[in-house]
Swiss-Prot record:
Bilayer topology annotation: Multi-pass membrane protein
Localization in the cell: Cell inner membrane
Upper classification of the organism: Bacteria, Pseudomonadati, Pseudomonadota, Gammaproteobacteria, Enterobacterales
Signal peptide feature range: none
Organism in which the protein naturally occurs: Shigella flexneri
Protein name: UPF0208 membrane protein YfbV
Tagged with keyword Hydrolase: no
Length: 151
């Protein structure tokens, strides 16, 4: 996945974008076969919740049993890096331009929203996955579920 050339995205802003993308993406079961985001978001949320305590427990357990400090720290750092890897991936995905097949579907969903009377801001440049997430979230709130039939 490559980021668009017209946007400068630094390493740390990807985490912020990933957090925003995970909150924006609609976790609908009908989207799961097409988009991997549902699984990645669920696992990232799980990792954010449970990996820090697991890292602390692992560190304390290995030190209490007289284990070496090096492997204990390495294991704890690996456990702490898992949520960051998920957020980084989501951030990269959010700024990735849509492929042609999904791009056509994106414009169809936007057209259905506009036909239903919704006012949408014009799309600037090539739409990315964040724009798709915003559009899908709005479509799930405003439209009936039949807009997914041609997915």
């Amino acid at each position: 996945m490559s980021t668009p050339d017209n946007r400068s995205v630094n390493f740390f802003s990807l985490f912020r974008r990933g957090q925003h993308y995970s909150k924006t993406w609609p976790l609908e079961k009908r989207l799961a076969p097409v988009f991997v985001e549902n699984r990645v978001i669920k696992m990232t949320r799980y990792a954010i919740r449970f990996m820090p305590p697991i890292a602390v427990f692992t560190l304390c357990w290995q030190i209490a049993l007289g284990g070496l400090l090096g492997p204990a720290v390495a294991t704890a750092l690996f456990a702490l890096s898992l949520p960051m890897q998920g957020l980084w991936w989501l951030g990269k995905r959010s700024v990735t331009p849509l492929p042609p097949a999904i791009l056509n579907w994106f414009y169809e969903v936007r057209g259905k929203l506009q036909e239903s009377g919704q006012v949408l801001a014009p799309v600037e440049g090539k739409p990315d996955y964040q724009a798709l997430a915003d559009t899908l979230k709005r479509a799930f709130k405003q439209l009936d579920k039949t807009f997914l039939d041609d997915l």
